[in-house]
Amino acid sequence: TVLATGGCGQVFRVTTNCRQNTGDAHAVALQAGLPLMDMEAVQFHPTGIVGPGNLATETQRYVGGNLRKKDLEPFMAKYAPKMKELAPRDLVARAIETEIREGRGILNPDHNIEHVWIDLRHLSDYVQEVQIPEVSGFFKQFMNLNPRTHLCPVRPSNHYQMGGIPTNSFGEVQKSPGTTISGLYAAGECGCASFHGFN
């Protein structure tokens, strides 16, 4: 038997996960008396599109997109003076969350969620059409915003569950370290072999 139900991203208000990722395998494991491990280890993508949670990929920041707070001032230099928007995901996600929690975010009235802006307006047509067409397309499709003329709302979005049902490197479920359950496997986000670390 293989458990492969995905993670539990739907417990978060903003997630990149599909609606089916509700932690079903985790619940089944707990009900069967099996342990879970490292459930606090959750990766957040820094720039999820407000509402659907879809990723606005790192590419938008790599090509020159700027994160801005409520007063439209950029803020990443405060958290990563040299790398700014190109800092590692976890640092950018924490910086955005800090700005929001300290009152410098913007409330999106349609979704009742606070966010910051990603500013892509200054990017050339070539960049918008060739280098980041999917990002521009997502903002148009899900938010009815044109990144050439509008600031776009983003916030950290639950992305990947590192913890889950303990397995060995073959995916066999472990009742305790070194003790596997014959014929029971966990794969993907519902399992945890500690390959990914905590982020």
Predicted feature descriptions by range:
Residues 4-9, 190-191:
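Glycine-/small-residue-rich beta->alpha transition segments that form the dinucleotide
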Residues 28, 34-153:
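An anion/pyrophosphate-binding glycine-rich loop and adjacent beta-alpha core
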